[in-house]
UniProtKB/Swiss-Prot annotation:
Keyword check for Repeat: no
Swiss-Prot/TrEMBL keywords: ATP-binding, Cytoplasm, DNA replication, DNA-binding, Lipid-binding, Nucleotide-binding
Function of the protein: Plays an essential role in the initiation and regulation of chromosomal replication. ATP-DnaA binds to the origin of replication (oriC) to initiate formation of the DNA replication initiation complex once per cell cycle. Binds the DnaA box (a 9 base pair repeat at the origin) and separates the double-stranded (ds)DNA. Forms a right-handed helical filament on oriC DNA; dsDNA binds to the exterior of the filament while single-stranded (ss)DNA is stabiized in the filament's interior.
Organism: Xylella fastidiosa (strain 9a5c)
Assembly description: Oligomerizes as a right-handed, spiral filament on DNA at oriC.
GO cellular component terms, semicolon-separated: cytoplasm; plasma membrane
Name of the featured protein: Chromosomal replication initiator protein DnaA
Length: 439
């Protein structure tokens, strides 16, 4: 509806744009005779719209379309002429009304590319979806850098819960949405309704809980919401950009609660997984690219899945626009600037600094000639990371480490690869450092 689009544009000049994006953009408008039906994904959004925006919505829709009657309903805009199911104004979530708690149905386990870096996280999300509320994985916390698939797995788990039991009420929220809703409820003195909505769902999925850091009242309300859901054996799935105990500003009691269930890290994908992701994403787009092009992207883009997708999208778009075949030469030409920016972001000096900080050393220690174990291992690890994450040759890496010979760098890379197969601590250090480069 054109009138609805104009209504949203006007509202963005009257209310904070982030509020319009969070609470009003999810609504789907449909004209039915002398009324406009606004479809919301869940009762929580309907209640907020009814309390804060409905009066102004009626005024604007009347102005732009001449229709003043506005009906709120749960669901999606129907493709047929059937009438919508009106919202139950008693505040109860009827099991006969389809409930869509902001879940993106595009994300599922079938289109999630599994690799060593995310294998455990995928298995944990699958178990949570199959047995929601089981204490072995409640809460389930997925943590790791940006663009590694945490939200994908969260959506996939929620979608499976709905497939197994269509009446299951799964709500997904970004942490900012939880915070914004709570602030509005405090302002409107409607905290009882705020709490009731969360207590009536079967599963709660919240993204990026590090956003709660330093927000005492938000943590207070989430703490009580967590307890109510946990005691009711309702599944809780959360994501964070790092292990919660490393997040400054989170209350100790909340950190303790988060440790009750299962916490699983998602690490940056290895080369094989990156290549598989590129090929899978290309198939999703109906594009065909040679394996060597997928290998090129996987080799150059190391940090996260979003960077891989960005490179692929750029490549496919230019190929479609120019009509040229996707060859290695075409790919190198198209992605030149993107790859150069990636290399500038992760340079050898940056690697040296991050490794030195991680081990509590100074960069001059890594570059020194001393061969004590406390220095030799971090130095070898830094060299191996430089080989993995940059396009520098072995001699160039050696030069960056105080003029060491290329054979020294080669030995370091082989040694680290060999030791990671048997030394759990070294493998953990490698994974943690790789996560830092994906942040």
């Amino acid at each position: 509806m054109e009138s609805w689009s104009r209504c949203l544009e006007r509202l963005e000049t009257e209310f904070p744009p982030e509020d319009v994006h969070t609470w009003l953009r999810p609504l789907q408008a449909d004209q039915r005779g002398d009324s406009v039906v606004l479809y919301a994904p869940n009762p929580f959004i309907i209640e907020l719209v009814e309390e804060r925006y409905l009066g102004r919505l009626r005024e604007l829709l009347s102005y732009f379309s001449g229709i003043r009657e506005v009906v709120l309903a749960i669901g999606s805009r129907p493709k047929t002429t059937e009438l919508p199911v009106p919202v139950d104004t008693t505040g109860r979530l009827s099991s006969t009304v389809p409930f869509n708690g902001n879940l993106d149905t595009h994300y599922n386990f079938d289109n999630f590319v599994e690799g060593r870096s995310n294998q455990l996280a995928r298995a944990a999300a699958w178990q949570a979806a199959q047995k929601p509320g089981d204490r072995t994985h409640n809460p389930l916390l997925l943590y790791g850098g940006t663009g590694l698939g945490k939200t994908h797995l969260m959506f996939a788990a929620g979608n499976v819960m709905r497939q197994v039991n269509p009446t299951y009420k799964v709500m997904y929220l970004r942490s900012e949405q939880f915070f914004s809703a709570m602030i509005r409820a405090l302002q409107d003195k409607s905290m009882d309704q705020f709490k009731r909505q969360f207590h009536q769902i079967d599963a709660l999925l919240i993204d990026d809980i590090q956003f709660f850091a330093g927000k005492d009242r938000t943590q207070e309300e989430f703490f009580h919401t967590f307890n109510a859901l946990f005691d009711g054996k309702q599944q809780i799935i959360l994501t964070c950009d790092r292990y919660p105990r490393e997040v400054n500003g989170l209350e100790p009691r909340l950190k303790s609660r988060l440790a009750w269930g299962l916490s699983v890290a998602i690490d940056p994908p290895d080369f094989e997984t990156r290549a598989a992701i590129v090929l899978a994403k290309a198939r999703e787009r109906g594009a065909t690219i040679p394996d060597e092009v997928a290998f090129l992207i996987a080799k150059k883009m190391h940090s996260n899945v979003r960077d891989l997708e960005g490179a692929l999208n750029t490549l496919v778009a230019r190929a479609n626009f120019t009509g040229r075949a996707v060859t290695i030469e075409f790919s190198q030409e198209t992605l030149r600037d993107l790859l150069r920016a990636q290399q500038q972001t992760i340079g050898i000096p940056n690697i040296q600094k991050i490794v030195a900080d991680y081990y509590g050393l100074q960069i001059k220690d890594l570059l020194s000639k001393r061969r004590t174990r406390s220095l030799a291992r971090p130095r070898q690890l830094a060299m191996a990371l430089a080989k993995e994450l940059t396009e520098h040759s072995l001699p160039e890496i050696g030069d960056a480490f105080a003029g060491r010979d290329h054979t020294t760098v080669l030995h370091a890379c082989r040694q680290i690869k060999l030791l990671m197969e048997t030394e759990t601590k070294l493998r953990e250090d490698w994974d943690k450092l790789m996560r830092k480069f994906s942040e």
